[in-house]
Regions:
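Phosphate/NTP-binding elements of NTP-utilizing enzymes
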Residues: 2-372
């Protein structure tokens, strides 16, 4: 970790008044630092710059982590470091980076592009390839950065446990800080539930939560820029995308409004609950007074037990009850209609954020999702 003078120099050379600055988080002593926020506030910039400064000044190696193997090709890893001014960072000792065979190496080239000096910066890993890294040695790794850990696509099976096992493989019994960078694209993320980060869905810009899980400290920051950016901000973002990119709000898609009043002009035929990542959705198959069937989705604050005789799909609920499933498999025609409703656009939500969360949850819990 940087000492006081190194922090002063780093702050003077790198800090922008318009972007996120995570010095408090870096000095918090947490083993896991979860950084959430919009795409344009500088989360990755700060942490990458900090880790590279700590490497050059103190020899601290870093581990760059992604979810899938296709995300850590040498070209993609090199692109991640493409914006680094290696000459400025290293006082002219190095001028570029080479990524191959799982290693990130700073290099100095002569006029003929021949490498004349090099130094190991760190390593890169994919959680999906975790079995490949066992029995290998990665000395002096003190930082790990997991980029884009929040996704609207599929997570790996037991991903949060596999991440911890990968960190254990990398650092063994040594001290390490793992920084997890995520954009506010969905609140339905298994890490939030499995690590009991219960307040994350309700966090707003500037909030900081500290969780203690056994001997491990997890710090969660809903990152905010230091101050409002100048009015020359990009005109390429508008609507819901601007709220997430520029205004640091949870992203939500836009969905069709229910053509009838679901409570005054329809009746419930069947109810099922979907639960994942600390979010529960009540899904009702309804028939309108005009004859058409549709699906109505609302969020609920409901805690299930193994004894509840309600229809529940949840990975967190282990039970032998026929009412409970860990993945959604229709048990009756009404539940089969839910799949049809998704395909035909006959599913409606009480608000857009509910629809966004349900799409992520349904994709996770359904064996054959066909969301549009």
């Amino acid at each position: 970790m940087l000492d006081k003078k190194q922090w002063d120099d780093f702050r003077a050379s790198s800090r922008s008044p318009y972007h996120y600055w995570g010095e408090d988080a870096a000095q918090s002593g947490a083993q896991y630092i979860v950084e959430l926020g919009g795409r344009s506030i500088g989360k990755s910039y700060f942490w990458r710059a900090l880790m590279l400064n700590d490497w050059f000044l103190n020899g601290a190696k870093m581990a760059y982590i992604r979810r899938y193997g296709e995300d850590i090709t040498p070209a993609k890893v090199a692109q991640y470091f493409a914006g680094v001014d290696w000459g400025k960072l290293t006082d002219g000792r190095f001028d570029g980076v080479v990524c191959k065979a799982g290693q990130i190496t700073a290099v100095k080239r002569d006029d003929k592009r021949k490498v004349i000096d090099s130094a190991l910066v760190g390593y890169y890993f994919a959680i999906a390839l975790d079995e490949h890294y066992k029995s290998s040695d990665y000395p002096e790794v003190q930082w790990a950065i997991f980029e884009e850990f929040v996704t609207r696509g599929r997570y790996l099976p037991d991903e949060s446990d596999r991440l911890q096992n990968l960190i254990s493989t990398i650092v063994r019994d040594n001290a390490c800080t793992c920084v997890m960078i995520g954009n506010t694209i969905t609140r339905a993320c298994p890490y939030f539930a499995e690590w009991s980060l219960t307040h994350v869905p309700r966090m707003v810009a500037g909030d900081v939560d500290i969780y203690h899980v056994g001997d491990t400290v997890i710090r969660v920051d809903m990152c905010a820029a230091a101050m409002d950016a100048p009015k020359k901000s990009s005109k390429m973002f508008f609507g819901k995308s601007k709220k997430m990119v520029a205004q640091n709000e949870w992203h939500s898609d836009t969905f069709a409004k229910c053509p009838v009043n679901p409570y005054a002009e329809s009746r419930v035929l069947h109810t099922i609950y979907f639960n994942d990542a600390n979010i529960t959705m009540r899904v009702e198959v309804r028939r309108s007074d005009y004859g058409d069937a549709f699906v109505w989705v609302t969020p609920v604050d409901f805690k299930f037990t193994r004894l509840d005789k309600v229809r529940v799909v949840s990975r967190q609920l282990t039970s032998l009850s026929p009412y409970h499933q860990s993945t959604f498999r229709p048990l009756c025609p009404a539940e089969g209609f839910i799949l049809t409703a998704v395909e035909q656009g006959k599913i409606y939500y009480c608000d857009n954020l509910t629809g966004t969360d349900f799409n992520t949850i349904f994709l996770t819990l359904c064996t054959t999702p066909k969301l549009k």
